[in-house]
Amino acid sequence: MTTKPENPYSALERIFHEPNRLAIMSALCGSANGLTFNELKEECGLTDGNLSRHLKALDEAKVIKIKKAFVSSKPQTTVFLSDTGRENFLEYLVALEGVLKKAALAMALEKKPASLPSILGKIARV
């Protein structure tokens, strides 16, 4: 009996696959202390409303934590990756890397088998 190989696309979680959410999660990965709403808005190039909508979806999925506080008598929202979010996003990135390598390999073989080492070298550097 042969087993069917796992679909590599099944691990691409929809919550992360939207480009703005991918940007938000990527920005948060580099900040152990979280990012303020305004820092995230600037880094990701989003409007207040657009960022709020995506943060709500990520919060409902429990992949981020949102802390609201007053700093110098002004409200401040800070966003952090949750432990689950960090783990799930890393799994997503590994799955995405596998899908991209598979696509690059298919394109290299279709174009010119001799270019395969060059393309795989570029993928490895990313």
Question: PLM features: what roles do these ranges have?
Answer:
Residues 2-7, 26, 87-126:
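Amphipathic alpha-helical dimerization/coiled-coil segments
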Residues 7-50, 69-71, 76-80:
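N-terminal helix-turn-helix DNA-binding core of bacterial DNA-binding proteins
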Residues 43, 52, 114-116:
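Short amphipathic alpha-helical "recognition" segments used for binding
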Residues 55-56:
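Short, hydrophobic-biased segments on the C-terminal half of alpha helices
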Residues 62:
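Glycine-centered, phosphate/nucleic-acid-interacting loop/turn motifs that mediate DNA/RNA or nucleotide
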Residues 66:
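Short beta-strand "wing" residues that participate in macromolecule-binding interfaces
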Residues 71-92, 96:
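Basic, amphipathic "hinge/linker" alpha-helix immediately C-terminal to the N-terminal HTH DNA-binding motif
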